[in-house]
């Protein structure tokens, strides 16, 4: 079993320009790839969990989102990306703040929940962490590596 670092996508892994549908629209958050590499070196699963209502809104197709996620997986050490396609008011157990995406990841990976956390940039991310009974770290939308390193070092000391 290994701990998981669950990362929100838009605003944590990439710059949140609204609905990012294509690789040409993608811009990495400063330090995100290095932060992902550091987490992997510490023995974490790195798992992205993201609400993608652009699909339900008709602004992106599921194949577009999956192709973008395949590109991210090919260019980082991220282990998996889970997304929810539903609108905020839809009753979906996967859409954050519900913990469904994290729970599915727990079925797919041997996760040490006692050492896992979720890093996000919105209250719904922190609520999803709370609903999954793990700590939530709120990123200020900039380079989050220091925040995560401090958190991990406090947990291991």
Please state what every model-predicted region is.
Residues 14-16, 57, 127:
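Conserved protein kinase catalytic core
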Residues 12-16, 48-51, 80-82, 103-106:
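A short alpha-helix capping/helix-coil boundary motif
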Residues 3, 63-80, 89-118, 122-157:
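Asp-based, Mg2+/Mn2+-dependent phosphohydrolase catalytic module
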Residues 22-29, 58-62, 95:
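Flexible, glycine- and charge-enriched loops at secondary-structure boundaries
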Residues 12, 59, 121:
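Gly/Ser/Thr-rich helix-start
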Residues 1-47:
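Active-site neighborhood of HAD-like aspartate-dependent phosphohydrolases
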Residues 10, 53, 98:
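Anionic group-transfer/hydrolysis microenvironments
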Residues 32, 36-69, 78-87, 129:
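Substrate-recognition element of Asp-dependent hydrolases with the DxDx(T/V) motif
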């Amino acid at each position: 079993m290994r701990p998981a670092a669950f990362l929100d996508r838009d605003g944590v892994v990439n710059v949140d320009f609204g609905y990012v549908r294509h690789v040409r629209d993608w811009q990495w958050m400063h330090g995100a790839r290095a932060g992902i590499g550091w987490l992997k070196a510490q023995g974490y699963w790195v798992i992205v969990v993201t609400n993608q209502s652009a699909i339900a809104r008709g602004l992106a197709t599921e194949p577009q989102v999956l192709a973008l996620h395949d590109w991210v997986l090919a260019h980082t050490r991220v282990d998996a990306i889970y997304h929810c396609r539903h609108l905020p008011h839809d009753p979906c157990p996967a859409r954050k703040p519900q913990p469904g995406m994290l729970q599915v990841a727990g079925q797919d990976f041997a996760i040490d929940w006692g050492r896992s956390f979720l890093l996000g940039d919105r209250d719904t991310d922190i609520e999803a962490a709370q609903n999954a009974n793990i700590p939530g770290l709120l990123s200020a939308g900039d380079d989050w590596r220091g925040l995560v390193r401090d958190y991990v070092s406090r947990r291991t000391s």
